[in-house]
A protein has these predicted regions:
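Short, well-ordered beta-strand elements
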Residues: 24-33, 51-58, 81-82, 127, ...
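Glycine-centered hinge/linker elements that transmit conformational signals in sensory
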Residues: 163, 210-241, 286
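C-terminal lobe and pocket-closing loops
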Residues: 265-278, 289-389, 417-419
Length: 419
């Protein structure tokens, strides 16, 4: 009997030992503001697969991770498996990221917004999977639009007229500090986002097309930037030329702007203690430049990708599939109000309770505009810098729009080839 028991038990022990041997550990980079969420996701993945994810906290300023990534990838280090990536880094690191197209189930890929997934498809490879997304949105004083009987504007021209009318009437009513529109016109990456939104929604593309064609020196772009230049000093203060997200948000949340372009996080901050506009805020996709064009909020999602030098590519890809999947995206939305990149979650009751505006703004995520980081790759930062500096000069009156865009196009033709 003992012999029979041993004979029966040995194969089971062997299977258990084999199962233990198959357990793997992958090294994962995570944003510092999301560390607790990453730990929670790693725990859930271990419960499901038996594998472990070692979570490494990235620098507080995410851009400081770029030289760290460059060093690790240049050394072909196997110390890191999974990288946390900004959308504009994908082109920069695409040569060192694993193609996930055959490692992530097609159904899981298709669950995401097409534009979000498309931003990670470079050189016919899927170099990363979306973790969550941001997109430029328009916030507005719904109480003031109701007060003056104004509909939500559908075009930038309508916004311009409505902003000026309400601004002037509110000033006449004893509110001298109010402006029609607060946005980001400082000379920095945020202006690249704002300007691309204007140009793209006017049918002008996104500076450089996916095939490498420079598209900025065209009438649609001239028209869009000229319109924005006209806002300075009329519906936007001169100080907007130094506004980033936080400076413009402060103006809106103090009650001194009718319209405000920013990222989805402003929904939460505008309803927080200290805001002067609690329960007075509406939100909508950005207007279009011309009828028939798409609202083109700048796409700002974050991704997870796998290092090409990982010694455990299949396991690392499995973690990426898990952490970017529906369950973990719902967890991030409910726990911390992160915006999912999976459309199905936009009708989820638990998610909508936490982020109620999602049900009204799904189209903004679907129609978003992509910065040209895919084609430009490692030269993206130089391309963006040339763009936002040129646009800032135009807005401030230091350069004419049409000649400035022509000169910019010539400069971009050279910069794009140094990718």
């Amino acid at each position: 009997m003992l012999n029979r028991t041993l004979a029966f038990s040995l194969p089971i022990l062997a299977l258990l030992a084999a199962g233990t041997a198959r357990a793997e550990t992958v090294s994962v980079f995570c944003a510092p503001t999301e560390y607790d969420l990453c730990i929670k996701a790693a725990s859930a993945w271990k419960d499901k697969t038996g594998n472990e994810a070692k979570i490494n906290k990235m620098p507080q300023l995410l851009d400081d991770a770029i030289p760290l990534y460059q060093q690790l990838l240049a050394a072909k280090s196997t110390d890191v498996d999974v990288l946390f990536l900004d959308v504009i880094w994908l082109g920069m690191f695409k040569a060192n990221l694993l193609d996930l197209s055959t490692l992530i189930p097609k159904a899981d890929q298709d669950a995401h917004f097409p534009s979000t997934l498309a931003a990670a498809k470079l050189d016919d490879k899927l170099v990363a999977m979306p973790a969550y997304m941001d997109v430029g949105l328009m916030f507005y004083r719904k109480d003031l639009l109701e007060k003056y009987g104004k509909p939500v504007p559908k075009t930038w021209a309508e916004l311009t007229v409505t902003a000026k009318e309400i601004q002037d009437k509110e000033r006449a009513d004893g509110k001298p500090d109010i402006w029609g529109y607060a946005w980001q016109a400082k000379s920095y990456e945020g202006l690249t986002c704002d300007a691309i939104e204007l140009v793209s929604s006017n049918g002008g593309g996104n500076i450089i097309a996916d095939d490498g064609k420079v598209t900025i020196d065209i009438p649609a772009a001239v028209e869009a930037i000229t319109m924005a230049k006209g806002w300075i000093g009329t519906i936007s203060p001169e100080g907007v030329l130094n506004y980033d997200e936080e400076a413009s948000r402060a103006v809106f949340e103090s009650g001194n702007a009718v319209f405000h372009r920013n990222w989805p996080y402003v929904w939460g901050t505008s309803h927080a203690t200290g805001s002067a506009v609690i329960d007075k805020v509406g939100m909508m996709p950005l207007p279009v430049g011309k009828a028939g064009e798409k609202s083109s909020g700048c796409l700002g999602p974050m991704y997870y990708g796998v290092s090409k030098f990982s010694s455990k590519p299949e396991v690392a890809a499995s973690f990426v599939d898990f952490v970017t999947g529906s369950d973990m995206q719902k967890m991030r939305a409910v726990d911390a109000a992160f915006n999912p990149s999976i459309p199905a979650l936009y009708t989820d009751a638990d998610v909508l309770k936490k982020i109620p505006f999602l049900k009204d703004n799904q189209q903004a995520f679907s129609d978003s505009a992509v910065r040209p980081s895919g084609y430009t790759g490692t030269s993206y930062n130089r391309v963006s810098q040339a763009f936002y500096r040129t646009v800032h000069d135009m807005l401030s009156g230091d350069a004419e729009v049409a000649p400035g865009l022509k000169d910019l196009a010539a400069k971009l033709e050279k910069l794009k080839e140094s990718r």
